[in-house]
Regions:
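Ser/Thr/Pro/Gly-rich low-complexity, intrinsically disordered segments
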Residues: 1-3
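Iron-sulfur cluster-binding electron-transfer modules in prokaryotic oxidoreductases
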Residues: 19-299
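Polybasic, lysine-rich low-complexity intrinsically disordered segments
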Residues: 14-17
C-alpha cells in the first residue's frame, strides 16, 4: 500500500517462480494422524466492535490494487475504527506454502506473527490470505508448541473484510448511486475455507439500487489459484474463460469480488478478449456507492 496512510490510518514502522517441491501424497499419512488446524469454518461468535484494528494489506493489493486497500481502510474509518497498518508486513506465506516450500513459508509466517502480536483484530480484504492466517499457520507451526499459542491468538482475531463489516461492525449501508445490475464473484477460499461467501452478498443486499444477478459459474473457481495460474496456464486459461463468459452472459454491468487475486485473473482475461468489462474489489464498490447509516450517514 502507499506509504501515505489514509485519514486516521496509523502506519506502524518497523520474477522467477521456483519449481514446487514434491510433497508426500495424503494417502501416506499414518492412519492415526490428527488434524493440527481447527476444522474449516463453522458458525463462530463475534466480538463487539473494537476501537482499533490491524489491516493486513496482501501482496496482490499492495502491487496491483493499492486503491482497494485504501478503500478498505476508509470503510473501516467510516465506522469510527482506527486502522493500524504495520509497514513491515509482507506476504502471508501462501505461495511458498502451497508450492511445498514449508520452511520458507514458516519464516514468512513467523514475521507476520511478530507484527500482529497485539490484541487488536486483524482485518484482511481477501479470503485467501485470511484463510492462511486463520487455518494454515497451525500446520506450519505444529512442531512448535510455544508458537502455536501465538497462532491460536492470531487465528481467533483474523477476519475477512466483508465478514468484519457485517458481523462485527454491524454496518447498515445506504445506496447513493444509480441503479445497477451487478455480478459477484466469490473466491474459492471465501466459499470453501472461510465460509464468508455469503457476507458479500448480504452487504450488497442492503443496497436498494443494486440488483445482484446470478451467473452460470457462480460457485466455480476463476482459475487463478495463486501460482497455479502460472504453473498450469492452459487449465487456468480455460477456467477463467468459462468464468468471464458466464459473467458477461449474466447481463451484469459491473463485476465485484472480495479477492484481488481473482480480479487479477478475471480482468486480465477481459482485457485479452478486448472486453471493456472490468471487476473491482468489493471495498471500492461499497465506498463509491454508499453512505453509512450506522455512522450517521457519513460517506
Amino acid at each position: 500500500l502507499p506509504s501515505r496512510p489514509g485519514r486516521g490510518c496509523i502506519a506502524l514502522q518497523n520474477d522467477e517462480i521456483p519449481e514446487p517441491k514434491r510433497m508426500s501424497p495424503l494417502s501416506s499419512a499414518p492412519a492415526n494422524a490428527t488434524r493440527v488446524a481447527p476444522p474449516l469454518e463453522a458458525a463462530r461468535s463475534y466480538p463487539a466492535k473494537p476501537a482499533d484494528v490491524y489491516l493486513f494489506g496482501t501482496c496482490v493489493i499492495d502491487v496491483f490494487f493499492p486503491g482497494a486497500g485504501m478503500d478498505a481502510i476508509r470503510l473501516l474509518e467510516r465506522e469510527g475504527i482506527r486502522v493500524h497498518f504495520p509497514q513491515a508486513q509482507s506476504c502471508c506465506g501462501q505461495p511458498a506454502y502451497t508450492s511445498g516450500y514449508t520452511d520458507e513459508a514458516r519464516e514468512v509466517a513467523r514475521a507476520q506473527l511478530a507484527l500482529f502480536a497485539g490484541d487488536w483484530p486483524v482485518v484482511i480484504p481477501s479470503g485467501s490470505c485470511a484463510g492462511m492466517f486463520r487455518h494454515h499457520y497451525f500446520e506450519l507451526f505444529k512442531d512448535e508448541p510455544e508458537t502455536l499459542q501465538q497462532v491460536a491468538s492470531l487465528s481467533a482475531r483474523t477476519f475477512e473484510l466483508a465478514e468484519f463489516l457485517l458481523e462485527v461492525c454491524k454496518v447498515r449501508f445506504e445506496h447513493t448511486g444509480a441503479p445497477v445490475r451487478l455480478a459477484l464473484h466469490t473466491s474459492c477460499s471465501a466459499r470453501r475455507e472461510m465460509n464468508t461467501h455469503l457476507h458479500g452478498r448480504a452487504l450488497l443486499a442492503q443496497l436498494a439500487g443494486v440488483e445482484r444477478v446470478e451467473h452460470d459459474h457462480e460457485s466455480e473457481c476463476c482459475g487463478f489459484g495463486g501460482s497455479f495460474s502460472v504453473r498450469m496456464p492452459e487449465i487456468s486459461g480455460a477456467m477463467v474463460q468459462d468464468k468471464t463468459a458466464a459473467l458477461k452472459g449474466s447481463g451484469a454491468a459491473e463485476v465485484v469480488s472480495a479477492d484481488c487475486g481473482c480480479l487479477l485473473n478475471i480482468n486480465g482475461c477481459f482485457e485479452k478478449q478486448g472486453d471493456t468489462l472490468r471487476g473491482e474489489h468489493l471495498a471500492s464498490f461499497l465506498l463509491r456507492r454508499t453512505t453509512s447509516a450506522s455512522t450517521g450517514g457519513v460517506r
